[in-house]
Amino acid sequence: KPKIITAIGMFYDLEKPNEFIKDASLALDDKGIFIAQLMCLKTMIKKNDLGNICHEHLEFYSLKSLKYLFENNGLEIFKIQENDINGGSYRIFCRKLNKGSIKLNEGNILKAINNFVKRVKKNRLQTTNFINKKIREGKKVFLYGASTKGNTVLQYYNLNKKIIPFAAERSPEKWGKYTIGTGIKIISEKMARDLKPDYFLVTPWGFIKEFV
């Protein structure tokens, strides 16, 4: 039996998480470790990460829900690490269920979610007001990065090709294509620079250190 099983960057995409964890528990050596890396609800709320709510993310786990999920299927959480991957993630270490998971305290999640909704609405208003004001002044606003998560923000903010004509993108396979639902044309970074935009709206903000 394997001594280590990993689930990296895919745990929130699972259609049947209970079945997956139960199978992992059965397959794991009695002294083995199951490691899951995933974005959690706490991080999403703290950083106002609206873009995390996209088509491929089927679940958004609080630590309390993860504890319940793992313990119901034969595993317990014994260690949690936080990192900056994808704008902020958890690396969760589990073992066969014995004494129960470590104490996990997140505070009032429902209150945090309600505050998250208010902040997202405020961000939308501030961002769209700023962009529309600059366009009225004759400025050009482009996107930087045609990211999957960015599509959620663009659609919720109602930022389409009439407002933002182009998205600068590093990946050649995306050039000449369009953002989903908003129809913004994706071009190379060089082409975007040649057009001399006044502002870039960064959508893959979780990787901003790599290109600023």
Task: Give the predicted meaning of each segment.
Residues 10:
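Hydrophobic adenine-recognition pocket in adenosine-nucleotide-binding enzymes
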Residues 15, 29, 136:
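Short conserved AdoMet
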Residues 36-59, 63-65:
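Short, glycine-/aromatic-enriched active-site segment of Class I SAM-dependent methyltransferases
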Residues 87-92:
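Short hydrophobic/aromatic beta-strand or adjacent loop that forms the aromatic wall/cage
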